[in-house]
Amino acid sequence: MKKILTTPIKAEDLQDIRVGDVIYLTGTLVTCRDVCHRRLIELKRPIPYDLNGKAIFHAGPIVRKNGDKWEMVSVGPTTSMRMESFEREFIEQTGVKLVVGKGGMGPLTEEGCQKFKALHVIFPAGCAVLAATQVEEIEEVHWTELGMPESLWVCRGKEFGPLIVSIDTHGNNLIAENKKLFAERRDPIVEEICEHVHYIK
């Protein structure tokens, strides 16, 4: 059975979710990447949309005007680690509950997710057009002076996903754990290979 989170998301909605789980989102998803994080954290400019209980997407979408509405054409995730230095404070200040992106994040985000009860989740890369089909409507747009990729596109999604949980509210970090596991497995394998190819200089 699909695990579907619906905004507004509460802390108790997240307590039984663990890293590695696959979930889906129904409700509000706001594209929010580098400049948005910098404006809030470094420049102290309030975000012109209430993110409390909502989800953000590290993404720079392609949109087009269709009559008096905006239409999502493509919306793929961008590398979440670029926001690592801001994300803990961003979660604290906004009350956002779901951070969607590409790849893992580090210890600051771990701390933010654990302390303020949020998740970081990974949307599969290379599926930007699929993601766009899961956006039912663009409801609002803010900070358009930043250009299309950096604007805040307030989207309504239905069963947006799949989203792989990489950081949960208990401080577990799937990508960090996997890196450690891979390193442990790598060393004996490399050693064995070297025994067979030691003659190669």
Swiss-Prot record:
Gene Ontology molecular function: any one: L(+)-tartrate dehydratase activity
Assembly description: Heterotetramer of two alpha and two beta subunits.
EC numbers, comma separated: 4.2.1.32
Full protein name: L(+)-tartrate dehydratase subunit beta
Gene source species: Shigella boydii serotype 4 (strain Sb227)
Domain of life: Bacteria
EC class of the enzyme, as a word: lyase
Gene3D superfamilies for this protein: Fe-S hydro-lyase, tartrate dehydratase beta-type, catalytic domain
Disulfide bond sites: none
Catalytic center residues: 37
UniProt KW keywords: Lyase
Reaction(s) catalysed by this chain's protein: (2R,3R)-tartrate = oxaloacetate + H2O
Coiled coil: none
Family recorded in the similarity comment: Belongs to the class-I fumarase family.
